[in-house]
Design a protein with these regions (language model features):
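Core nucleotide-handling region used for phosphoryl-transfer chemistry
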Residues: 1-281
Length: 281
């Protein structure tokens, strides 16, 4: 049982919002609610808050319908937990620069969510919904894709396309399968086979021995590929950390929330990279 399910045994979804800053997004017709922490209002290390990252529960039963990643942090952000990471057995994957997408089965059909919505809204400046865009990335509608999937699993993906660009450009709509969760056991499960059977991409896998090797790699990538976002490392206990490229962070700060902030231009100008900046925006 998740901590949020235990919480809801004695409290309500309204309490989640008022006490922990958890945003609730209800489906317009089905008994589903998306739970997401608030970057500012939610206590970031609270166990309930950590679980509420695109999590979907059945409103009536509180059963898990969609299980995504728990919240995880940038390396160095929560120093008390850095020592828990097991560098004797860990994997590293590229961090793709798109939008979280969650593919799941409910009430007899396959569906797809973004982290904060049921993907039924029209994408900004486009004539199609988020779900329709995801189907373009998958190359088929969700029901056809679902033939190769297990209805007891949530498929955690990164949807990348020209329509939801953050910093890195993706010329075509693509779907990266990041991992999968069994919604009964809540355990993470292998997903390479599902990627092969659906045509979804997988992040690039790297082999490193320690954090220093990762940081050197990212410094090299920053020079070769400035929009490369970074990597996610995961140990055998399921602990995850993200480590981002310094140039990606600079470009992301420069872009801001779709508004350019002049103060973030200075490091690029001092480095003589002002011409290169123009190619990213």
């Amino acid at each position: 049982m998740l901590a949020v399910q235990e919480y809801l045994q004695t409290k309500s979804f309204s309490d989640l919002e008022s006490e922990l800053g958890i945003k609730t997004t209800y489906h317009e017709s089905d008994p589903l609610v998306i739970l997401n922490y608030n970057q500012i209002e939610s206590p970031k290390l609270h166990p309930v808050v950590r679980e509420c990252r695109g999590l979907v529960l059945n409103v009536n039963t509180h059963d898990v319908v969609v299980k995504s990643f728990n919240r995880f942090f940038n390396w160095g952000e929560v120093q008390d937990e850095m020592g828990d990471f097991d560098f004797t057995d860990f994997t590293v994957q590229s961090k793709e620069d798109g939008s979280l997408a969650l593919i799941y089965h409910f009430d007899g059909k396959w569906r797809a969510n973004t982290r904060g919505s049921f993907a039924l809204d029209v994408m900004q400046f486009q004539g199609f919904t988020w779900q329709e865009a995801m189907c373009q990335a998958l190359g088929a509608d969700l029901q056809k894709v679902g033939v190769a999937l297990n209805p007891q699993h949530t498929y955690v993906c990164e949807f990348c396309s020209p329509w939801n660009k953050v910093v890195r450009r993706y010329p075509n709509a693509v779907m990266y399968l990041l991992t999968a969760f069994d919604r009964q056991t809540l355990e993470e499960i292998p997903c390479d086979g599902y990627a092969r059977s659906t045509g979804m991409l997988r992040p690039t896998v790297y082999e490193f021995k320690n954090i220093e090797e990762i940081q050197r790699f990212l410094q090299e990538q920053a020079e070769k590929d400035p929009t490369f976002e970074g990597v996610v490392m995961r140990d055998r206990h399921g602990h995850r950390w993200k480590i981002k490229s310094p140039t990606y962070l600079g470009l992301h700060r420069l872009k801001g929330n779709d508004t350019f902030n002049p103060k973030h231009l200075l490091p690029f100008i001092l480095a003589g990279e002002e011409d290169e900046l123009l190619t990213y925006f």
